[in-house]
Every structure is written in structure tokens, then in C-alpha cells.
């Protein structure tokens, strides 16, 4: 094993030589200076706080420690977490991880590393990942509301936390339960120099946006709040703004709704604003001192935020109601009493809010009832504290640490040595300090310090901190671990550091002097009933739920338990919980008092090493056995290593264990057989057993696979053989059936042929020679008849647009079917034409002619299709003057409309009336009633028109005519399609020739002797024929723009 390869110093202190305090300290210092902060004592991890981030964490290291046993890699918290998790998962043993040490030694970070490792290595899946994320995200929420900067630690836990993480049989997390112990709520109203209040206040003021601050009626400046230490508002290495956003995100992940988060922040801001409520003296006629609120603004803002009348708040803060069974008396409070009531209310609100947050987290991460689970507990509790001024909080904190030290002693030092004695294992006793006498001094039910404090709080008459101290001096004057000024004077000892109001306890970690001032008040932890009832009357749902005892209907005159009694009871439950689990220890050490990286104070570390009992722990580990287990469980786990015990063993458990270890040829010095357990001295031997078991499991897995594969192949072969026989039988039967069918069909065919031949032979004289033709003709006619009758019943509609036709049922009738389809269509067309009047026929012929001339050629043609040709667009029939224009021309006027004539010289237009008759085209001025120009249709040579939507066209005349000698005409008509169609038909009727209609954008027009090129272009407006712009370009070119 590579435990000693490439190591700095000794990685496991069990191997340290010589085993003295000096060499132990030098080894820790050498490793610390080389950034090796973890060291083993057997399976105990010693962690020295580096005060910096080291590159020894993350997924890469988690994967590495997951694949190796405890001693195969460098010492690490991950290794201990892996051992605990595997013992829980594989050996079905509940585990607990105890993290102890002074304040600032790195306990909180160690607990985070344990939780992150367990979360990384346990199961996967959407639900499992959700549970893991909720467990991990509980840390930033609890740290924000329960941690603060102290003189010794920038992120000191000011409460105790024990988390039970619950797993299923596969080792996947199901949820958890968090238990909190004694929040240091006195910090809320007063902090020592260089310390801060709880983190959440600074995070809220730094990280909340302006809208949230306005809603909470807060200002960002921390100097505006009496409860915040103005000297230290920022901490190096902490970003309060980003931490606040992280807390909000973590609360959402855990399951807090947006409304719950808002209510928590409102109660938090209310506590902060309570500190700014100033109390002043008020005059009463009776002369009794009274008090009142100096500035009502703060009280009004609090009332508006939580839905409470400001007068109700002021009355509750400045007066007190004394109630007995018969009467109720209201007394005014003086300024000191009102300030005490204000601070007591703030502390109670915050403490109850913290408890509510813990319970709310537990609701989200709790496991369903009835589920079988395994448990891993992680204890992160405040460290041992020795301050300049130690009060009630330090007393109960150090009492808790005494109990944890007692757990370590009894489960590691005392229990281990007593177990050797019970099991009959030879053992040399190792002396150690048993702190049970100190625990008894504090917690004894009748004569302990806590019992005396409760008795003094409940005693009638004048009670004070000094009477409590006098009682302690009387009871413990001869106790070896108790000192005070009175006991020192009695022994004629003089200590100027001991005050008159102080007592001293010699703890396992050193002597601590406690100032009894406020011990009685802090232990009573009383809140006046007026304040309870006022908070219950609030309309704020969360605040109201924090004070259920404020409900007058549930009012009780019973005195609530004291803070000391509650804490003692909680510690007792915690100890019972820890004793029920297999312990794993992380002993945290603080290398210096200044939280500086790289500094190692030998005196400070030596003090911690002594009271943690590291040397005694090493001696016990060196003299003892690394692993012990009952014969039954040991045999159950390792019996597969022996052919004698595997797969069945009918003898006793101890004999079976001896058989297993005997076949493995284990050294007798490595083993000891107790009365009920087997003891293994070194971890190396245990690892060897585990390795042999792993190899054997692989062999058994291979054997199982081999047997399973053989069984599967045999089963598959038998199934295939059975299937083959079945298929063969069915195939042979089917082949015989087919063969029989063919033979039968052949026989029937031969029989039919023979019978036919015999019949034809016998009846040939009765047959006519043309019978076959007659039958064929009959069959063909039947087919034709059937086809024609079917066609008759399925004829398409008589609509000329319907061209559907049934298909021929026989190929021989396809030609006839096509002829019938053509005849039917022609008949439908004739029938349609016969129904038309002559006028309708003429209209359709004109439309047909227009289609042949302009369809697909002229852009304006589609618009003219649905519009009937009118012919008369100037009201010719109703105007006798206009009728005279046709002169002596006989017959009707085919077209009459107003057109525009383009001037040959300048390109300007002038209005004209155009009449089209069967023989002439007549142009006249609109102001005159006589024809100006008469053009015979035989003189019209052709017409040119553009493909655009304009109405421009050129009327080309024969040069030989008298009218044509002056040149062609360039005209513009709004009905150019109709005009040219009628002109085309009139020319055809008059001259028996087709009029040439040219569609083009470029054409030549003859003006007298000159030829002018006309070019028509599309303008940007896009083809509206109502506007044409003419522009002459030289004497032989005219450009027309269609706008």
C-alpha cells in the first residue's frame, strides 16, 4: 500500500516515533507547511485549518477516493466520508460524523466537504438529484441566518446543527432531518468590538434591489441601524450582495415559495427596525417612572409592514399586564424595562424565525413515513470558546463541547479498553483524562450548575445573579474543577483576573471564567404576555404563526421551561442519537489566532492537542486492534473465502471463523479471538480480507455467469429443437398436402378431358360447324350490351365544363369508348349552343376573338374578361347630334367612345370621339358635330399595342390612301381590348382579310414623311393606364412612360 510513498512526515500518527508531544507537533507543523492539512490517527482525521483554498477538492479527487480504500491514498476528509458511506451502504450500519474543535478551526467547511462528497458518490436520477440539491442548498440558508463574524472566525456558526441524512437500501438519499441547538440570539442586540451581527442583515442591505428595499422600508446604509456594529460592516473575502442572491436561489431550490421568501425578509427587516425604536421618559401624575416612544415613525412603519396598529405596538413595549386568577393590573415600564422588552421581542422574533426556517427546510427534505432507511448523521456545532467576557451563551456552548468530548472518550478510549476486558483480550491499560466529573458538575439533576440556575429562577422572593453565584460558591466550594473569588479567598489564593461576579470551570480544553451577569435573565428568556398577544394580533401570516401562545383562548399561566433546561434536554437527545450510531471523527485544529495562512503556533496547537487527547488516542490505537466484529456477521461476510464454509456451514460461528482464517494462513499476531468477537490488529489485514473477498466475488460472479449462460444455452437449444421438430412436421405435412392437391387436380383434369373427349365423340353428329362463331358473336354482343347499358346508367353531367368519362371495362372496347366520349362532348357543346340567343352568340364570339388576340400577351386582358363589351360609351343612342357623325353610313355603330389622340409634333394629347362602323373608323372633335377624319377599313394596314396595362395603340394606315398620306394615328383608349377586337372582326367582315395586331413595347409610327420610333416603358408606379407621360427624344423618337 502506498501510505508512506512520497509522503511528508508521517501520515498516520500511529506510526509516529518517538510517541511524544514534541514529535507530534513537529509532524503536524511539517505537514501543514507543505499544505498537507490532513493526518490520520487510525480512522480519525485531524484537520488543520489552512485559511486558504487548496487544490485538493472537486470531482477529480472525489472520483479518486471513491475507488480506493482508506489507507491507499493521502489522508483526506473524502476518505473518511467514503468509509462512512460504504459502511452504511454495504454493512447496513447507521453512521455519524462528529466534527469537533475550537471556533475558527474549520468545522463548518469540513461538514460541507462531507456532504458534498456523499452527494457526489450516491445514486443518480432526477428525484435523487433533487433531494441532493435540497440537502446541499440548506447550508447557505442556515449560514446566512445562523452564522456571524466573530473575533476568531469570519463565518462562525452561532448555533448547533445536527443533520441526519437518510438513505434507501441502495445508498441513494431520500431526504433528511435538521436539528438546531441554541441560537446565540443575544448577538442580535449587542456584538463585541470587531464582530458582526448575523450575516443575513448585511446581505439583505447589500444585495436587495431598490424596489425590495423600498417595500421593506429599509435603507442600504448599515450605519442607520442600531443593531448592526458600525465598525465592521464588511468582511474580507465575503461578497454580501452575491451571497444574498445565493440565499434567495437556495430557498427557491429547497421549496420556499416566493410569498414565503417575501414574508421571511419582512420579518427580518422588522427585527432590524425594532432596534431603531427609541424609548424616552414620560411624566405621570403619580410620579411613577414611565416610558414612551420618542419617534413614532419607526413603529408606524413596523405596523404597516406586519398589519399591526402602531398604538398597539407602543402599548405592548411600554407597559406590562400582570394577570392573576381574579384580577388584571397594567403597570407602566420605565425606560430600562421598555428597552429590555424591545430587545427581548427582537431576540424572540429572530429566534422563532430561525426555528421556523429549519422546520420549513425539514418539511421539504423529510422522508415519507414507512420507508425503510439508513441514516448518516453530520454534527456541526459551535466550537469551544474562551473569550474575554464569557456569558451564559459560552457556558452552554462549552457544556455541549464537554459532552461531545465525553462521547469521544467513552466511544473511543474508554469503550475500546472496556471491550478488550469484556472479551478477554490481553491489554495494557492506557491512562486518559475522563471529563465525566465536569459534565456531572454542570448537568447533575439535583446539584448541577444548570439545576441550581433553574432553581434560582423559580425561587420566590428577590432573585439576582449574585444570589445564584452565592449558591454555587456554597455547593461547589470544594469541587476540584470549580473556582470563584470566594473559594480562592478561602484557600488563600489570590487571582486578580477573577472578578467578584465570576466563577471559573476547569474544562477539558482549559480554564474558562464566566461572568454571571444576565445569567438569570438569559436562562428565564421571558417575553411579556402583552408582546406575545400583540404579535399574535398581527395580520402578517408568518409573524402571527411564530407566536401561537399569544392567542388569548390558548393562554396558559404555566411557566415555560428555561433556556438551560431546554438545551440540556436537547443535548441529552443528541447524545442518545450519537451513541446509537457508528462514530467517525474529524478533529479540527486552529493553527493560529489571527486567521492567517501559513502561520503555525506550536503553543496554541499543543493546547488543542492536549485537550483533544490526541496522544492518548494514538496510544490506544497502537496498543489495540483496528477492527472488531461479531463472529456471526464476520462469518456471513467472509465465509465465501473457505470451501469448508461455502456455500453452507452447519457448525458454530466461531468455528466457522477459525476455518476461514485458518485456510487463509493469517498470522496469529494479527488476530485475537474474543468471547463474542474477532479482533484484527492492522488495517492492512482487513484490507487483505476485503481484497480476497472482492476476488472471490468476481470468481463467484464468473461461476454464476457460466452456469447461467449454460442454462440459457441449453434452454435455448431445447426450445430450438422443439421448434425445429414442430416446423419439420408442419412442413412435411404441408408438402404432402400440396402434392396430394396437385395429383388430385391432375386426375380431375384428365377425367374432365376424357369425359369431354367422349362427349364430343358421341355427340359430334349433332353439332353444327358454325356453332363456335355463333357463341363467340353472342358473347361479344353481350359484352357490348353490358358496356352500353352501364354507360347509359353512369353518364356524366351535361355541363360543358365537365370532361369526366367512365373507363372502358374491356380493353377491346377502349377505341369505341373514346369515340363515344368525343361524340358525347360534341353533343353537349351543340346542346349548349342551341340554348344561346343570337346576341349571346355574338358576345361569346367577340370574347373568343379577344382571347385569341390578347390572352397571355396583354397585361390588361384578364381584367376585361368578366366585363361585357358595351360598344357605346358616350351615349350615342340618346344623342341625335352624335348620331349625325356617322353620316350616310348604313348599319349600326360597332364602337363609340372618347379617346385621346397623341399630337404628331409635340407629343401632347387631345380628346377625340371615335366611331367604328362596319366600313369606317371615324374621328371627330368633341366640340364639333361633324366628322373630322374618316378612315375606310380597307385602308387600315395594322395595329400596334403594348403588353402593359396601358390603353395606347397605333393605327397604321396604308400609304396609298389619301388619309394615310398624312401618317399613322397614335391613340389612347380606356377600352383598348374591346375596340381592337371589334375592329379586327369588322376588318375581317369588310375586306375578308385578318387585321395585323402587333403586341410590342417598341414600334414605328409614320408621321407624314418621317418615321418615329415609339418606346413604351413601365414607370415606378406600376402600370396604371390612366396616366401616360410622353417625352420626345430627338425628332425621330418618342418615349412613353406608363405611370
Curated annotation (Swiss-Prot):
GO terms for molecular function: actin filament binding; ATP binding; calmodulin binding; microfilament motor activity. Keywords: Actin-binding, ATP-binding, Calmodulin-binding, Motor protein, Myosin, Nucleotide-binding, Phosphoprotein, Repeat. Phosphorylated by ALPK1. Residues 571-593 are annotated as: Actin-binding. One of its GO terms (biological process) is sensory perception of sound. ATP binds at residues 101-108. GO terms for cellular component: actin cytoskeleton; apical plasma membrane; basolateral plasma membrane; brush border; cortical actin cytoskeleton; cytoplasm; filamentous actin; lateral plasma membrane. Residues 697-719, 720-742, 743-772 form the IQ domain. Residues 858-1042 form the TH1 domain. Residues 8-694 form the Myosin motor domain. CDD domains: MYSc_Myo1. The keyword Cell inner membrane does not apply. Pfam families: IQ, Myosin_head, Myosin_TH1. Involved in directing the movement of organelles along actin filaments. Belongs to the TRAFAC class myosin-kinesin ATPase superfamily. Myosin family. This is Unconventional myosin-Ia. It comes from Homo sapiens (Human). The gene is MYO1A.
Amino acid at each position: 500500500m502506498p501510505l508512506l510513498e512520497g509522503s511528508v512526515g508521517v501520515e498516520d500518527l500511529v506510526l509516529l516515533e518517538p510517541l511524544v508531544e514534541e514529535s507530534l507537533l513537529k509532524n503536524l507543523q511539517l505537514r501543514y507547511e507543505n499544505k498537507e492539512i490532513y493526518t490520520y490517527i487510525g480512522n480519525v482525521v485531524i484537520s488543520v485549518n489552512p485559511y486558504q483554498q487548496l487544490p485538493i477538492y472537486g470531482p477529480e479527487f472525489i472520483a479518486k477516493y471513491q475507488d480506493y480504500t482508506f489507507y491507499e491514498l493521502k489522508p483526506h476528509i473524502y476518505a473518511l466520508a467514503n468509509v462512512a458511506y460504504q459502511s452504511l451502504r454495504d454493512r447496513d450500519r447507521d453512521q455519524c460524523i462528529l466534527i469537533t474543535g475550537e471556533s475558527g478551526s474549520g468545522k463548518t467547511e469540513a461538514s460541507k466537504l462531507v456532504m458534498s462528497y456523499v452527494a457526489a458518490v450516491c445514486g443518480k436520477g432526477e428525484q435523487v438529484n433533487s433531494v441532493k440539491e435540497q440537502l446541499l442548498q440548506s447550508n447557505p440558508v442556515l449560514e446566512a441566518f445562523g452564522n456571524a463574524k466573530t473575533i476568531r472566525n469570519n463565518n462562525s456558526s452561532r448555533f448547533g446543527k445536527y443533520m441526519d441524512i437518510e438513505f434507501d437500501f441502495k445508498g441513494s438519499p431520500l431526504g433528511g432531518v435538521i436539528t438546531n441547538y441554541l441560537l446565540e440570539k443575544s448577538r442580535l442586540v449587542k456584538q463585541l468590538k470587531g464582530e458582526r451581527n448575523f450575516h443575513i442583515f448585511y446581505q439583505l442591505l447589500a444585495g436587495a434591489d431598490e424596489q425590495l428595499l423600498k417595500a421593506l422600508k429599509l435603507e442600504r446604509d448599515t450605519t442607520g441601524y442600531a443593531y448592526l456594529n458600525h465598525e465592521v460592516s464588511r468582511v474580507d473575502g465575503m461578497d454580501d450582495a452575491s451571497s444574498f442572491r445565493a440565499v434567495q436561489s437556495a430557498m427557491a431550490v429547497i421549496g420556499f415559495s416566493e410569498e414565503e421568501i417575501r414574508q421571511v425578509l419582512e420579518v427580518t427587516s422588522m427585527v432590524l427596525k425594532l432596534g431603531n425604536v427609541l424609548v424616552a421618559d414620560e411624566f405621570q401624575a403619580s410620579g411613577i417612572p414611565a416610558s414612551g416612544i420618542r419617534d413614532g415613525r419607526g413603529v408606524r412603519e413596523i405596523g404597516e409592514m406586519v398589519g399591526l396598529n402602531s398604538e398597539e405596538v407602543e402599548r405592548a413595549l411600554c407597559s406590562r399586564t400582570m394577570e392573576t386568577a381574579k384580577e388584571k393590573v397594567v403597570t407602566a415600564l420605565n425606560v430600562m424595562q421598555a428597552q429590555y422588552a424591545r430587545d427581548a421581542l427582537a431576540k424572540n422574533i429572530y429566534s422563532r424565525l430561525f426555528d421556523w426556517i429549519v422546520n420549513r427546510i425539514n418539511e421539504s427534505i423529510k422522508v415519507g413515513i414507512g420507508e425503510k432507511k439508513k441514516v448518516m448523521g453530520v454534527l456541526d456545532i459551535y466550537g469551544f470558546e474562551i473569550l474575554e467576557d464569557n456569558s451564559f451563551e459560552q457556558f452552554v456552548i462549552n457544556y455541549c463541547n464537554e459532552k461531545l468530548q465525553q462521547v469521544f472518550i467513552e466511544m473511543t478510549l474508554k469503550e475500546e479498553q472496556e471491550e478488550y476486558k469484556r472479551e478477554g483480550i490481553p491489554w495494557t491499560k492506557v491512562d486518559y483524562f475522563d471529563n465525566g466529573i465536569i459534565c456531572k458538575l454542570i448537568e447533575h439533576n439535583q446539584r448541577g450548575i444548570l439545576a441550581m440556575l433553574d432553581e434560582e429562577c423559580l425561587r420566590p422572593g428577590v432573585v439576582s445573579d449574585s444570589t445564584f453565584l452565592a449558591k454555587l460558591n456554597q455547593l461547589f466550594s470544594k469541587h476540584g474543577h470549580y473556582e470563584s473569588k470566594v473559594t480562592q479567598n478561602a484557600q488563600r489564593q489570590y487571582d486578580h483576573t477573577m472578578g467578584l461576579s465570576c466563577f471559573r470551570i476547569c474544562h477539558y480544553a482549559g480554564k474558562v471564567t464566566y461572568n454571571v451577569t444576565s445569567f438569570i435573565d438569559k436562562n428565564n428568556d421571558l417575553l411579556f404576555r402583552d408582546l406575545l398577544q400583540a404579535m399574535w394580533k398581527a395580520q402578517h401570516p408568518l409573524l402571527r404563526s411564530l407566536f401561537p401562545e399569544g392567542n388569548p383562548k390558548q393562554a396558559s399561566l404555566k411557566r415555560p421551561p428555561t433556556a438551560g433546561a431546554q438545551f440540556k434536554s436537547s443535548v441529552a437527545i443528541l447524545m442518545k442519537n450519537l451513541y446509537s450510531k457508528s462514530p467517525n471523527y474529524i478533529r479540527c485544529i486552529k493553527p493560529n489566532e489571527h486567521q492567517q495562512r501559513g502561520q503555525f503556533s506550536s503553543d496554541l496547537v499543543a493546547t488543542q492537542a492536549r485537550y483533544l487527547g490526541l496522544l492518548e488516542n494514538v496510544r490506544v490505537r497502537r496498543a489495540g486492534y483496528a477492527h472488531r466484529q461479531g463472529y456471526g456477521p464476520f462469518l456471513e461476510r467472509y465465509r465465501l473465502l473457505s470451501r469448508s464454509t461455502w456455500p453452507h456451514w452447519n457448525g458454530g460461528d466461531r468455528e466457522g471463523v477459525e476455518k476461514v482464517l485458518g485456510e487463509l494462513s493469517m498470522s496469529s499476531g494479527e488476530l485475537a479471538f474474543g468471547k463474542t468477537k474477532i479482533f484484527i490488529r492492522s488495517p492492512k489485514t482487513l484490507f487483505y480480507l476485503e481484497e480476497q473477498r472482492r476476488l472471490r466475488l468476481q470468481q463467484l460472479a464468473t461461476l454464476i455467469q457460466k452456469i447461467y449462460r449454460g442454462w440459457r444455452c441449453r434452454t435455448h437449444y431445447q426450445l430450438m429443437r422443439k421448434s425445429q421438430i414442430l416446423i419439420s412436421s408442419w412442413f412435411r405435412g404441408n408438402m404432402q398436402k400440396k402434392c396430394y392437391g396437385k395429383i388430385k387436380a391432375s386426375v380431375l383434369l384428365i377425367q374432365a378431358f376424357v369425359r369431354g373427349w367422349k362427349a364430343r365423340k358421341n355427340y359430334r353428329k349433332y353439332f353444327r360447324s358454325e356453332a363456335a362463331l355463333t357463341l363467340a358473336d353472342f358473347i361479344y354482343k353481350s359484352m357490348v350490351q353490358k358496356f352500353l347499358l352501364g354507360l347509359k346508367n353512369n353518364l356524366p353531367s351535361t355541363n360543358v365544363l365537365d370532361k369526366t368519362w367512365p373507363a372502358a371495362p374491356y380493353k377491346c372496347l377502349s377505341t369505341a369508348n373514346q369515340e363515344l366520349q368525343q361524340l358525347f362532348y360534341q353533343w353537349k357543346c351543340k346542346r349548349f349552343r342551341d340554348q344561346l340567343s343570337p346576341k349571346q352568340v355574338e358576345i361569346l364570339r367577340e370574347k373568343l376573338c379577344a382571347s385569341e388576340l390578347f390572352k397571355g400577351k396583354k397585361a390588361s386582358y384578364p381584367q376585361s374578361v368578366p366585363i361585357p363589351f358595351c360598344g357605346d360609351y358616350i351615349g350615342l343612342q340618346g344623342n341625335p347630334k352624335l348620331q349625325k357623325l356617322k353620316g350616310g353610313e348604313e348599319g349600326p355603330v360597332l364602337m363609340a367612345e372618347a379617346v385621346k389622340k397623341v399630337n404628331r409634333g409635340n407629343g401632347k394629347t387631345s380628346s377625340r370621339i371615335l366611331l367604328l362602323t362596319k366600313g369606317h373608323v371615324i374621328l371627330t372633335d368633341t366640340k364639333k358635330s361633324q366628322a373630322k377624319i374618316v378612315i375606310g377599313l380597307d385602308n387600315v394596314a395594322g395595329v400596334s399595342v403594348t403588353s402593359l396595362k396601358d390603353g395606347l395603340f397605333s393605327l397604321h394606315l396604308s400609304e396609298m390612301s389619301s388619309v394615310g398620306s398624312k401618317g399613322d394615328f397614335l391613340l389612347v383608349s380606356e377600352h383598348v381590348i374591346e375596340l381592337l377586337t371589334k375592329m379586327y372582326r369588322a376588318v375581317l367582315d369588310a375586306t375578308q382579310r385578318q387585321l395585323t395586331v402587333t403586341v410590342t413595347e417598341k414600334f414605328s409610327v409614320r408621321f407624314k414623311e418621317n418615321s418615329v420610333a415609339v418606346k413604351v416603358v413601365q414607370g415606378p408606379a406600376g402600370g396604371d393606364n390612366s396616366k401616360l407621360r410622353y417625352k420626345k427624344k430627338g425628332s425621330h423618337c418618342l418615349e412613353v412612360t406608363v405611370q
